[in-house]
Amino acid sequence: MITKPDKNKTRQKRHIRVRNKISGTAERPRLNVFRSNKNIYAQVIDDVAGVTLVSASTLDSEVAGDNKTDQAKGVGELIAKRAIEKKITNVVFDRGGYLYHGRVQALAEAAREAGLKF
């Protein structure tokens, strides 16, 4: 019997491979994205200290949108605004093993337009 590979397990393996190569520092922290079926979460993380500096998600009341892609754009704008308030402008983008398409791409482009550099 042929079994289909679990999409989330392959994503996690891909994420581990990427995480072995990139790391966030205090000068250039990591912008991490996690996508669930209903929500999308973004965090700016300093991996050296092991601290989350800024976070935003669709669970925040400031994020509104008709569909998930619009909500992801709102999260991107919000994470960029909060990061710039803490004087963080340069980040390393960590797509979390997801394809750079759809909600992940919308979040990244909105964060870039709002002032984050990556």
Curated annotation (Swiss-Prot):
CDD domains: Ribosomal_L18_L5e. The keyword Manganese does not apply. Keywords: Ribonucleoprotein, Ribosomal protein, RNA-binding, rRNA-binding. Part of the 50S ribosomal subunit; part of the 5S rRNA/L5/L18/L25 subcomplex. Contacts the 5S and 23S rRNAs. Belongs to the universal ribosomal protein uL18 family. NCBIfam families: L18_bact (TIGR00060). This is Large ribosomal subunit protein uL18. It comes from Levilactobacillus brevis (strain ATCC 367 / BCRC 12310 / CIP 105137 / JCM 1170 / LMG 11437 / NCIMB 947 / NCTC 947). The gene is rplR.
